[in-house]
Amino acid sequence: MNDILDKIIDSDVLVFASPVYYYSITGTLKNFIDRTYAKYNKIKNKDFYFIASSADPSNESIDSALETVKGFLRCVDNVNLKGIVYGTNLNDAGEAKYSDSLKQAYELEKNV
């Protein structure tokens, strides 16, 4: 984990991505965020992007998951949320390629 944390500290951009289950990010991503605690005070001056997908047709579950991510961002110095890409109403594998979220991700990528 120290190697990964050192790469995060040295990076200019962070991108977190997660499917949304039960109005939250996955346990794997949450565990990863929690494991950054050992060096969280060295994670600073970054642009941050969040990518999420949800079966929920509304934005409610995405908004709830985003609150967890924003909690992490409030604890690190000068990490700026630059973009969010999310897809809703995605129930089956491959559906995202037909949604607007893929276009959003492509446009956002141009600015990274």
Set out the residue ranges of the language-model regions.
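Glycine-rich phosphate/pyrophosphate-binding loop and the adjoining helix
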Residues: 70-112
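Helix-loop-strand module that forms the ligand-binding subsite of alpha/beta enzymes
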Residues: 1-76
